[in-house]
């Protein structure tokens, strides 16, 4: 089983299949009644003939792929893009093919490609220095740094978390969140005294007590990044972890819910109870092993691992367990954050009485970082640090993105468009149960299972040939990660195309 899984990933068959396109043409879609953005855009971009396919005889993509592969392994590359011509929900490749993008750079495009408001922002003379000069924010921040943080990230700070540290990506956000948790936990144990001489000396040779043997509890199927600490908590695909040394940290089972939910209420409650019991057992077990669990990390929806959901009650009880055992509760909102579930942060759906202790973000937030409670504040400079600590130009862009989200009510749009998408997927499941099962989602953060990875990959390939970009996750799931400007008519457009694909699928 393990060798088969590894062989599949080493072969990268899924990535390769993206490039084996065959000429196909979907009829152009006249979208003159619906602009690429809610905000007016230049006339040439108003109507995007979204699904037209122009398979040119001399394909630029093949040449570019060969060039890139000379200098690095390019097997993961799906295709090369023309971002100058991409607008709104439509991505254009280097050969001129326009596609409805329902994957949006692995869920990292908040308000569509080349949004006119963002283009206008970067053209304003007073903003030029912010894009040209990238400061070492930890020691030499710009004069307006605090102001821009208040206008951007702090304006959407999750409940109970007043402290903020910016980073560049999701992995470094989680990695430094782990460090923050370990320092907080050791400070609790140390009390008021400072560092001992023994601690200062032993930490330099990676030994206790200077380097205590703490752990972070994670869940099977999780994905939290590819750096060393994050990789120890990532359990989605073997190819991510093979050959890399790691830590002996506890891994709990994540609920595997049965669908439709309303037909398996009792079974799903029992499944969640089983997983929660295992969490507590592992915390006790690792305490006895002298590998104390300092924190628990969890995704609101396991994304890379297969879009695995759990009930709001599961997360409330998980938070209670963390508090009971003195563990920090870390919520990874790298992929779920930014509004795609219908709330700005997916964990807001849970209704926690006691907020999470730490929450990481990236992707749609255009920068990385983490919010945390006051008690997790580092007690000395340089303990959480790197050269750039993010990028102030991204805070400038994010402030405008948040303004647009609020002005155009894009959170409610995500909820409504997501309902249209989910309803349509349920209808397709009823009509084609041999291809679609376990339809699930929150907002536009939707997915379904296919019979196996071969069928999944083939469906994604055919969809791209018909002008739609989809993403895979887990062993056999297809996931949807559209932008926040994904509207009802985009959902209907996709559903019509995918219905035809399923009708002809063999």
What is each residue range found by the language model?
Residues 24-26:
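Ala/Thr-enriched low-complexity intrinsically disordered regions
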Residues 21:
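Adenosyl-5′-phosphate
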Residues 2-6, 31-506:
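Conserved N-terminal phosphate-binding loop of PLP-dependent enzymes in the Aspartate aminotransferase
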């Amino acid at each position: 089983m393990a060798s088969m899984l590894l062989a599949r990933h080493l072969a990268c068959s899924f990535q390769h299949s993206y490039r084996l396109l065959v000429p196909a043409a979907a009829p152009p879609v006249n979208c003159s009644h619906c602009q690429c953005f809610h905000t007016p855009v230049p006339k040439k971009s108003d109507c995007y003939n979204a699904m037209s396919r122009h398979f040119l005889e001399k394909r630029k993509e093949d040449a570019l792929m060969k060039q890139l592969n000379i200098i690095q392994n390019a097997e993961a590359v799906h295709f090369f893009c023309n971002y100058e011509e991409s607008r709104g929900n439509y991505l254009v490749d280097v050969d001129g093919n326009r596609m409805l993008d329902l994957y949006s750079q692995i869920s990292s495009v908040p308000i569509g490609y080349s949004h006119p408001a963002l283009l206008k922002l970067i053209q304003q003379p007073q903003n030029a220095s912010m894009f040209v000069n990238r400061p070492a924010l930890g020691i030499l921040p710009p004069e307006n740094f605090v102001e821009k943080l208040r206008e951007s990230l702090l304006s959407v700070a999750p409940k109970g978390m007043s402290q903020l540290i910016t980073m560049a990506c999701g992995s470094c956000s989680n990695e430094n969140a782990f460090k923050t948790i370990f320092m907080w936990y050791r400070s609790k144990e140390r009390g008021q005294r400072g560092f001992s001489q023994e601690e200062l000396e032993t930490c330099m040779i990676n030994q206790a007590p200077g380097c205590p043997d703490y752990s972070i509890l994670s869940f099977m199927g999780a994905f939290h990044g590819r750096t060393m600490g994050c990789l120890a908590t990532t359990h989605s695909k073997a190819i991510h972890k093979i050959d890399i040394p790691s830590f002996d940290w506890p891994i709990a089972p994540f609920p595997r819910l049965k669908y439709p939910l309303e037909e398996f209420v009792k079974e799903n409650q029992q499944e969640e109870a089983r997983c929660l019991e295992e969490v507590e057992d592992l915390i006790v077990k690792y305490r006895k092993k002298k590998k104390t669990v300092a924190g628990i990390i969890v995704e609101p929806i396991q994304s890379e691992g297969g879009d695995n959901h759990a009930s709001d009650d599961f997360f409330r009880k998980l938070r209670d367990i963390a508090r009971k055992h003195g563990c920090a509760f870390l919520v990874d909102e790298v992929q779920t954050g930014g509004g795609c579930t219908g709330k700005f942060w997916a964990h807001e759906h849970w209704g926690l009485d006691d907020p999470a202790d730490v929450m990481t973000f990236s992707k749609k937030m255009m920068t990385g970082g983490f919010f945390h409670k006051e008690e997790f504040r580092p007690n000395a400079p340089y303990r959480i640090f790197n050269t750039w600590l993010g990028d102030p130009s991204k805070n400038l862009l994010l402030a405008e993105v948040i303004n647009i989200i609020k002005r155009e009510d894009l959170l409610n749009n995500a909820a409504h468009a997501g309902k249209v998408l989910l309803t349509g997927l349920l209808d397709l499941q009823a009509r084609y149960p041999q291809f679609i099962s376990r339809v699930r989602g929150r907002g536009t953060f939707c997915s379904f299972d296919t019979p196996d990875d071969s069928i999944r990959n083939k469906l994604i390939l055919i969809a791209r040939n018909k002008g739609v970009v989809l993403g895979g996750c887990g062993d056999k799931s297809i996931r949807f990660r559209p932008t926040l400007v994904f509207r009802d008519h985009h959902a209907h457009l996709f559903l019509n195309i995918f219905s035809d694909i399923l009708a002809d699928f063999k």
